[in-house]
UniProtKB/Swiss-Prot annotation:
Protein name: UDP-glycosyltransferase 73C13
Keyword Cell division among record annotations: no
Gene Ontology process terms (BP): saponin metabolic process
Binding-site positions, an anthocyanidin: H24, A396
InterPro entries: UDP_glucos_trans, UDP_glycos_trans_CS
Pfam families found in the cross-reference section: UDPGT
EC number from the UniProt entry: 2.4.1.368
Sequence similarity: Belongs to the UDP-glycosyltransferase family.
Keywords, ordered alphabetically: Glycosyltransferase, Transferase
UniProt function note: The monoglucosylated hederagenin 3-O-beta-D-glucoside is a feeding deterrent of the yellow-striped flea beetle (Phyllotreta nemorum).
Protein residues bound to UDP-alpha-D-glucose: A356, Q358, H373, W376, N377, S378, E381, D397, Q398
Length: 495
């Protein structure tokens, strides 16, 4: 066992740097626990506000004997021109704060360097989020290998790798509506330019920031990916080859959450009582409920959210609809009551205003489908739970994840969204899927057609494969062993 080797032979010490956004921090905390379970000392470096978000989950892990500690560093907000109270990416009130936020994050280099000078035992490895390029300078200064964590799947990472090497493909497109085929890909997959996460809509300083991220990616020792070999074998193999063998698939990392409290409190504390949620779910038939959650940074306009709600109502199926960022959706709240929507659906629909215990809900026997924005965490959690996906991508890597789920894995149905929601242009884009489109897509996913049954069968099969991957002898379990042995050899050769 590697945990025995680490104790006897070399006391490995990993320092983890999660990016300050829920979708990035949640899997990084899971990774910390997985490594600590192998006897590795873990130090998580983050800001006070972000540390507070995960206090309960980490305290339970520490109380169980796992060697995890948190070191807090103050975000230099004022120095970067960032107003106080914007310590997380998902709390930014406008796109204008994006550049100051990233500048403040990368100004952490100096205080973190001082931390490393005093840290004991000396770190053997850094695991850093892709969005924190300054950690490359720390790794270089202290001669420590840096492992990168993107928070994406191999399908998406390979797509980005191929398109960066063949950038003329995207650059030569005549319009944003023109389709192109990704070359050198295991499957024939088409995209439009706005659907791939290699371009950006934010001008100016943002290009320099993303350039630093790409440069830091090139100089990292390797990459860990929250996926498993069984889920996307061809893409995992090709991406590993592209990274000269230094890519380890170690997921689904969410499966380290085995107790109810950990499942319920991943990220923020849930805004619904766990017992109340379970009572509602227990009252529904097996596989009958559609879980609807469009992520922590959903930017759909009011007109589209209304159509989504009406489509869910007309589907005549029980549903849970989670609306995060509730304070930004006051108009929707008014519409719920003024239009009579909330009253009409009260017996069949459960509205969760804020944060939901997503893993707890997805693993419940009454849930039979997941309408998702296709963020990779949610996509993987849905597939791991054996649920078919109704895909509604918004931006970033989400169109890649939709293609993987629907076209490659054949475990989902597309809602029909074909263009990203550009920040600041939501109202202009307006409604992309009307209520009839929503109703039709729900039926395609949850209905009794042969296609729907096959999608559900396939999703269940993938869920079983994902669970096997993290068990002893499974691919992800073995890859964690391989990663630790690699870093151990490196650490011993450096001494």
């Amino acid at each position: 066992m590697v945990s025995e080797i680490t104790h006897k032979s070399y006391p490995l010490h990993f320092v983890l740097f999660p990016f300050m956004a829920q979708g990035h921090m949640i899997p990084m905390v899971d990774i910390a626990r997985l490594l600590a379970q192998r006897g590795v000392k873990i130090t998580i470096v983050t800001t006070p506000h972000n540390a507070a978000r995960f206090e309960n989950v980490l305290n339970r892990a520490i109380e169980s004997g796992l060697p995890i500690s948190i070191v807090q560093v103050k975000l230099p907000s004022q120095e970067a021109g960032l107003p106080e109270g914007n310590e997380t990416f998902d709390s930014l009130v406008s796109m204008e704060l994006l550049v100051p936020f990233f500048k403040s994050v990368n100004m952490l280099e100096e205080p973190v360097q001082k931390l490393f000078e005093e840290m004991s035992p000396q770190p053997s490895c850094i695991i850093s989020d892709f969005c924190l390029p300054y950690t490359s300078k720390i790794a270089k200064k202290f001669n420590i290998p840096k492992i990168l964590f993107h928070g994406m799947c191999c399908f998406c990472l390979l797509c980005m790798h191929v398109l960066r090497k063949n950038h003329e493909i995207v650059e030569n497109l005549k319009s944003d509506k023109e389709h192109f085929v990704v070359p050198y890909f295991p499957d024939r997959v088409e995209f439009t330019r706005p659907q791939v996460p290699v371009a950006t809509y934010v001008p100016g300083d943002w290009h320099e920031i993303t350039g630093d991220m790409v440069e830091a990616d090139k100089t990292s020792y390797g990459v860990i990916v929250n996926t498993c070999q069984e889920l996307e074998p061809a893409y995992a193999n090709d991406y590993k080859e592209a990274r000269s063998g230094k890519a380890w698939t170690i997921g689904p990392v969410s499966l380290c959450n085995k107790v109810g409290a950990d499942k319920a409190e991943r990220g923020n504390k849930a805004d619904i009582d766990q017992d109340e949620c379970l009572k509602w779910l227990n009252s529904k038939e097996e596989g009958s409920v559609l879980y609807v959650c469009l992520g922590s940074i959903c930017n759909l306009p009011l007109s589209q959210l209304k159509e989504l709600g009406l489509g869910l109502e007309e589907s005549q199926r029980p549903f849970i609809w989670v609306i995060r960022g509730w304070e930004k959706n006051k108009e929707l709240l008014e519409w719920f009551s003024e239009s009579g929507f909330e009253e009409r659906i009260k017996d069949r629909g459960l509205l969760i205003k804020g944060w939901a215990p997503q893993m707890l809900i997805l693993s419940h026997h009454s849930v039979g489908g997941f309408l998702t924005h296709c963020g990779w965490n949610s996509t993987l959690e849905g597939l791991t739970a054996g649920l078919p996906l109704l895909t509604w991508p918004l931006f970033a890597d989400q169109f890649c994840n939709e293609k993987l789920a629907v076209q490659v894995l054949k475990a989902g149905v597309s809602a029909g969204v074909d263009q990203p929601m550009k920040w600041g242009e939501e109202e202009k884009i307006g409604v992309l899927v009307d209520k009839e489109g929503v109703k039709k897509a729900v039926e395609e996913l949850m209905g009794e057609s042969d296609d729907a049954k096959e999608i559900r069968r396939r999703a269940k099969e993938l869920g079983e494969l994902a669970h096997k991957a993290v068990e002893e002898g499974g691919s992800s379990h073995s890859n964690i062993t391989s990663l630790l042995e690699d870093i151990m050899q490196l650490a011993q050769s450096n001494n």
